[in-house]
């Protein structure tokens, strides 16, 4: 599909001058779910300076692929906690690899909005680029004193697709034994409507097939021209049919879309069986910023598909393994934007849907809340998914288009929306928010930033047609893969190789996705505050002629971490 990119937003302003030097080596502090009453500052930790204390707690769904109940249960708030993870030796040295020219959101750069000529982006330029951003200089990233993993309060859906479902079909002249298989195909992906069965009757003669109200049946005919003899005589024995029950026990932690306001800590927990739901809010009332986190275990019905093996007198099922997606998120606004909630937003919804958005900061010069449009996009995406009960037939760009159509606030934003269907990750992207797929400790796939130039990303603005802007991805995933989805606040400050190393070591240590997201958010903030650390943003600035620029780029940071796991059924 030809993609068009049109200019929206403002021309980039020169990057800011280096700030006062901070220590090159600093301890990185994180939060873990150990219940605390407030925020404890750690001496010597740059991450807790000013109003950006990194205490994140909570668990809620990402994740990409939360299996929701039939009625889309609401969420229930739970307890908060804190995690302390220390960085033994932060990477502050000079790496020797080729510089990566990255596009970044101009949300923090001063300047007025200028008229920009349209720039065409060819499909080849919009393709995935697997080049890395460079190695980490200095001491390697080390994780020390990693906390013990707490029990995940997620839900796991136990699906029994291969169980024989049945009842005996009777008519006036015959009583037959029927073997039926329910394929858990409520969304119609396997060609059957909800409630449809595949039935077979074993007889001793010719077979004929007929389709009756969604039921495919094979009737045994014993040479009779007018009617069947009683089936007890023609079949010989009646196969007992057992009815299988798809049992779903789901626990979702805070699948609410982030509204961008992170001055309070929200923790939700809902246990859903059938159609029950409950909501309980806890306002912790902290006077300082607490990043918003979500933790979720999302199970997608991949194991509902089965292959059939037929013989003369039986039909058995071979069930594929079910994959689940455990996801967690953390968000930290720019220190100067804490009161307004920052300009980032994200959502994690049912059935493997999630996304991030980054409002363009230049709108604030016109008196417009730059984060409001981004939050409306994420809220609209979640609403579209929930109203369609997981949107099994909807594409990611369709969900985004529906959200963009319903947004009412002026503004523009970068945005990424993704969906995991149990086997394939589908994603659409506009701008320099992006994702990394990490497999076996290495970057397997990644999105490519869509920019007009340095620090000038492509954006979607109110009234734009997303179908003309999006870059689409489809990636097969397997057990053990990790997906890191984030705004440019992460990718401008943390090298991709370092992100992959954090993911690998954290998973080995048994950390939950939300704890990994907290670590990455805190690391991005640490580099962003530094005037001396080398960063992907400083590399890109030097590459386009901003000589002498060093340090990171302090910005809003939002991270969603998802891990593909096999269901323990």
Curated annotation (Swiss-Prot):
Residue ranges with Basic and acidic residues bias: 179-188
Q: Which family does it belong to?
A: Belongs to the PP2C family.
Question: Which SMART domains does the UniProt entry name for this protein?
Answer: PP2C_SIG, PP2Cc
Query: Which intervals of the chain are annotated as region Disordered?
Result: 120-214, 251-279
Cofactor(s) the protein requires to work: Mg(2+); Mn(2+)
Identify the species of origin: Oryza sativa subsp. japonica (Rice)
Every copy of the PPM-type phosphatase domain together lies at: 329-564
Please tell me where Mn(2+) 2 binds in this chain: 358, 488, 555
- Entry binding sites for Mn(2+) 1: 358-359
Please give the function described in this protein's UniProt entry: May play a role in responses to biotic and abiotic stresses.
Q: Name one GO molecular function term.
A: metal ion binding
Entry EC no(s): 3.1.3.16
What catalytic reaction does the record list?
A: O-phospho-L-seryl-[protein] + H2O = L-seryl-[protein] + phosphate; O-phospho-L-threonyl-[protein] + H2O = L-threonyl-[protein] + phosphate
| Superkingdom, natural source | Eukaryota
Disulphides: none
PROSITE patterns, per the entry: PPM_2 (PS51746)
Q: Which UniProt keywords apply?
A: Hydrolase, Magnesium, Manganese, Metal-binding, Protein phosphatase
Cofactor binding note: Binds 2 magnesium or manganese ions per subunit.
Q: What is this protein called?
A: Probable protein phosphatase 2C BIPP2C1
């Amino acid at each position: 599909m030809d993609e068009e990119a049109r200019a929206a937003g403002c021309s980039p302003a020169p990057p800011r001058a280096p700030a006062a030097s901070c220590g090159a080596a600093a301890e990185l502090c994180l939060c873990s779910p150990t219940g605390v009453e407030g925020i404890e500052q750690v001496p010597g930790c740059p991450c807790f300076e000013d109003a950006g204390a990194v205490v994140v707690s909570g668990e809620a769904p990402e994740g990409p692929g939360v299996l929701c109940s039939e009625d889309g249960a609401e969420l229930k708030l739970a307890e908060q906690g804190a995690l302390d993870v220390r960085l033994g030796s932060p990477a502050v040295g000079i790496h020797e690899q080729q510089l990566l020219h990255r596009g970044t959101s101009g949300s923090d750069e001063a300047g007025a909005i200028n008229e920009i000529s349209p720039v065409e982006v060819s499909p080849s330029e919009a393709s995935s680029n697997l080049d890395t951003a460079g190695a980490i200089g200095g001491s390697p990233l080390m994780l020390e004193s990693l906390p013990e993993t707490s029990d995940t309060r997620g839900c796991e859906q136990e699906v029994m697709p291969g169980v024989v479902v049945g009842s005996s079909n009777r008519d006036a002249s015959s009583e037959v034994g029927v073997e039926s298989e329910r394929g858990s195909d409520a969304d119609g992906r396997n060609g059957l409507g909800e409630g449809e069965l595949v039935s077979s009757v074993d007889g001793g003669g010719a077979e004929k097939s007929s389709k009756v109200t969604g039921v495919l049946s094979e009737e045994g005919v014993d040479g009779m021209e007018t009617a069947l003899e009683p089936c007890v005589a023609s079949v010989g024995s009646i196969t007992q049919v057992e009815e299988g029950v798809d049992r779903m026990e789901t626990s979702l932690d805070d699948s609410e879309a982030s509204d961008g306001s992170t001055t309070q800590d929200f923790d939700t927990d809902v246990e859903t069986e059938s159609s029950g739901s409950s909501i309980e809010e806890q306002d912790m009332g902290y006077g300082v910023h607490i990043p918003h986190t979500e933790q979720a275990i999302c199970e997608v019905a991949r194991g509902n598909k089965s292959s059939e093996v037929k013989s003369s007198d039986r039909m058995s099922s071979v069930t594929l393994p079910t994959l689940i997606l455990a996801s967690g998120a953390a968000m930290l606004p720019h220190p100067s934007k804490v009161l307004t909630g920052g300009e980032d937003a994200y959502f994690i919804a049912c059935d493997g849907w999630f996304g991030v958005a980054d409002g363009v900061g230049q709108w604030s010069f016109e008196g417009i809340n730059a984060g409001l449009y981004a939050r409306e996009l994420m809220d609209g995406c979640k609403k579209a998914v929930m109203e369609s009960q997981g949107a099994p037939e909807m594409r990611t760009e369709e969900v985004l288009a529906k959200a963009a159509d319903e947004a009412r606030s002026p503004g523009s934003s970068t945005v990424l929306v993704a969906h995991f269907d149990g086997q394939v990750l589908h994603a659409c992207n506009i701008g320099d928010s992006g994702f990394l797929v990490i497999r076996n400790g290495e970057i397997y796939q990644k999105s490519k930033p869509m920019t007009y130039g340095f620090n000038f990303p492509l954006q979607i603005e109110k009234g734009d047609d997303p179908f003309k802007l999006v870059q689409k991805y489809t990636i097969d995933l397997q057990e053990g893969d990790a997906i890191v989805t984030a705004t440019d606040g992460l990718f401008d400050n943390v090298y991709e190789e370092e992100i992959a190393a954090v993911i690998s070591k954290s998973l080995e240590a048994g950390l939950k996705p939300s704890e990994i997201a907290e670590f990455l958010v805190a690391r991005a903030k640490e580099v962003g505050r530094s005037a001396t650390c080398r960063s992907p943003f400083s590399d890109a600035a030097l590459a386009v002629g901003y000589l002498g620029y060093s340090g990171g780029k302090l910005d809003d940071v939002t991270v969603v971490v998802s891990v593909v796991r096999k269901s323990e059924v």
